[in-house]
């Protein structure tokens, strides 16, 4: 048997999307992933024509809008005819314009608005006041003289009236508002978006034809198609126990294709005492991963959080610290260059500044530059928390994250490949906010990875875990997922979320992982199909590498499924 990839009469591998919604066709409002991170002279039309917002473009003056917080508001028209509302004479952070809406606890709401401020740039939040209290829906670093898109989302615990408004701590600035949208989606619609994206982004509809050596179709032929390797990296962190634990190895390699070492590559593990390096644990773990074709993320070179610095590091003078960090970076990156796919260069530098406070504000830029010089193939990531987990954390908001990336890019001049690392340690996920934030970050066109996914313990931990897992996997901008701390030899003493018990029997979270792997086609590594009367078979397959074998034949041939191969001709010749 051979696979013919050329010729005009051959069968085309169609890569059009097949939309499957758990067996149910859902007539859903399409979700708009558009996010604009440039500041514009004039705002675009509101998404979803404003959704349930009254007078979203302010074309009818102040209709539907009211004062919030004792400020003054007025309707204005720009020289080019754009209508907007300005909140001025502000004396408190929450003084702005507002609108009352009714929210349903069973729906998910995506929110967007275009914001401008006077005087100087300022972080502006959208706040929803409801029976649940005050909840931020998103924020943006608003500019002077141009419009910035604020995109976010909200859910509520109880149905009823609500009111949204805008706030900034800088009371000296006026807040300008235009093109506001609040669009509700049902749970079924939201899930249909995930299913559509999974089929469109992670899979392709493949049409194969089996023919004999003379090109004649072979009807009713039984073929076996085997997934050899899925393109999308999906995995979990590992610890040193995996090196000598066969059960651990079997459990991991049967499910995952990428990993991060939980501690063994970190500075406090490789140089506990000054000048005495020990990479034996990390080396053994890397050998295991390489043997089994598991991709490895380098985590991490430095960690800005002061509480994770060793005593001997804390005792160094600035000059000695510079020497020590140079040695550390050169040592770990040179050792593993070409063996890891990525580096978390200076972990959590949006929240902490241990090295920046001692070695200069641009030390992160220098760390990235030196890492890129030593390892020219790896993607260099920022890695931080609360960008998608908590919409109220100003330190790691989407705007703040993108600003830091912009500073890095400006310093590096495009000399290295940058990536967006989102730790994703969730408590109660705000799913619409997660999707909107991923939209914003994806507008940078940089690869996004979910690097340390888990959910804190609680009554709804497993429900939330499945929700967030489906959401991030289905987003077009996400290019890899690593779950954090899935196993502990001490029982359910994982960092937050155990997938299995000490004997590698599934816990509820492990059942979730196996369920979605099966749905996504990663557990169904072998698919048996029968050709029709014309020798054709149609399958929706993951992007990845496959082998195909005809019944009663031993030889297997390989083919690739990838969106880039649209229009490629494939013929299976018996």
Regions found by a protein language model. Name each.
Residues 37, 66, 188-193, 197-199, ...:
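Aromatic-rich peripheral "rim/lid" segments of glycoside hydrolase catalytic domains that contact
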Residues 218, 237-249, 354-460:
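Noncatalytic carbohydrate-binding groove/subsite architecture in carbohydrate-active enzymes
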Residues 243-254, 280-292, 330-335, 369, ...:
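Short amphipathic alpha-helices and their capping/turn segments at secondary-structure boundaries
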Residues 258-272, 281-389:
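Substrate-binding cleft and catalytic face of glycoside hydrolase catalytic domains
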Residues 183, 262, 346, 423, ...:
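Conserved residues at the C-terminal ends of beta-strands
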Residues 233-235, 257-260, 293-297, 340-344, ...:
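Structural preference for beta-strand elements that scaffold enzyme active sites
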Residues 4-238, 242-255, 315-316, 375-378, ...:
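Extracellular and organelle-lumenal recognition/adhesion modules and their flexible linkers in secreted
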């Amino acid at each position: 048997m051979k696979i013919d990839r050329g010729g005009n009469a051959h069968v085309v591998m169609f890569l059009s999307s097949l939309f499957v919604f758990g067996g149910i066709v859902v007539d859903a409002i399409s979700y708009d992933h558009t996010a604009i991170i440039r500041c514009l002279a004039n705002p675009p039309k509101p998404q979803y024509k404003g959704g349930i917002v009254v007078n979203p473009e302010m074309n009818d003056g102040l209709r539907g809008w009211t004062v919030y917080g004792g400020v003054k508001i007025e309707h204005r028209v720009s020289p080019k005819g754009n209508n907007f509302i300005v909140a001025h004479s502000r004396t408190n952070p929450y003084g702005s314009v507002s609108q009352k809406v009714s929210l349903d606890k069973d729906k998910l709401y995506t929110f967007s608005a275009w914001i401008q401020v006077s005087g100087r740039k300022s972080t502006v939040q959208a706040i929803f006041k409801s029976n649940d209290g005050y909840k931020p829906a998103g924020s943006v670093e608003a500019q002077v003289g141009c419009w910035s898109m604020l995109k976010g989302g909200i859910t509520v615990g109880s149905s009823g009236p609500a009111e949204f408004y805008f706030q900034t701590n800088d009371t000296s600035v006026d807040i300008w508002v235009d093109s506001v949208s609040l669009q509700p989606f049902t749970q079924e619609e939201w899930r249909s978006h995930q299913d559509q994206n999974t089929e469109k982004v992670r899979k392709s509809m493949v049409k194969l034809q089996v023919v004999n050596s003379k090109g004649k179709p072979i009807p009713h032929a039984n073929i076996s198609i085997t997934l050899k390797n899925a393109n999308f990296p999906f995995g979990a962190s590992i610890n040193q126990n995996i090196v000598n634990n066969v059960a651990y190895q079997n459990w991991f390699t049967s499910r995952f294709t990428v990993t991060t070492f939980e501690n063994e590559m970190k500075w406090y593990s490789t140089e506990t005492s000054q000048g005495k390096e020990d990479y034996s644990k990390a080396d053994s773990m890397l050998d295991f991963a390489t043997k089994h074709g598991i991709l490895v993320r380098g985590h991490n070179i430095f960690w800005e959080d002061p509480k994770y610095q060793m005593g001997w590091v804390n005792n160094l003078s600035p000059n000695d610290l510079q020497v020590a960090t140079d040695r550390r970076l050169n040592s770990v990156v040179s050792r593993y260059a070409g063996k890891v796919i990525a580096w978390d260069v200076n972990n959590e530098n949006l929240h902490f500044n241990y090295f920046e406070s001692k070695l200069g504000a641009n030390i992160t830029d220098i760390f990235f530059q030196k890492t890129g010089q030593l390892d020219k193939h790896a993607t260099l990531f920022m890695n931080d928390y609360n960008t998608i987990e908590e919409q109220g954390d100003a330190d790691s908001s989407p705007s703040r994250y993108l600003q830091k990336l912009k500073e890095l890019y400006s310093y590096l001049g495009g000399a290295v490949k940058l990536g967006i690392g989102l730790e994703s340690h969730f408590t109660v996920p705000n799913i619409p906010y997660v999707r909107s934030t991923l939209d914003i970050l994806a507008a940078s066109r940089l690869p996004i990875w979910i690097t340390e996914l888990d959910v804190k313990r609680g009554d709804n931990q497993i429900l939330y875990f499945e929700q967030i897992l489906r959401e991030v996997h289905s987003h077009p901008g996400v290019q890899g997922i690593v779950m954090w701390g899935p196993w502990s030899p001490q029982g359910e003493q994982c960092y937050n979320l155990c997938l299995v018990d000490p004997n590698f029997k599934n816990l509820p979270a492990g059942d979730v992982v196996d369920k979605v792997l099966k749905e996504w086609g990663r557990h169904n590594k072998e698919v048996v199909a029968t050709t029709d009367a014309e020798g054709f078979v149609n399958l929706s397959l993951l992007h990845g590498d496959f082998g195909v074998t005809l019944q009663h034949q031993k030889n297997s041939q390989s083919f690739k499924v990838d969106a880039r191969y649209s229009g490629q001709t494939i013929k299976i010749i018996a």
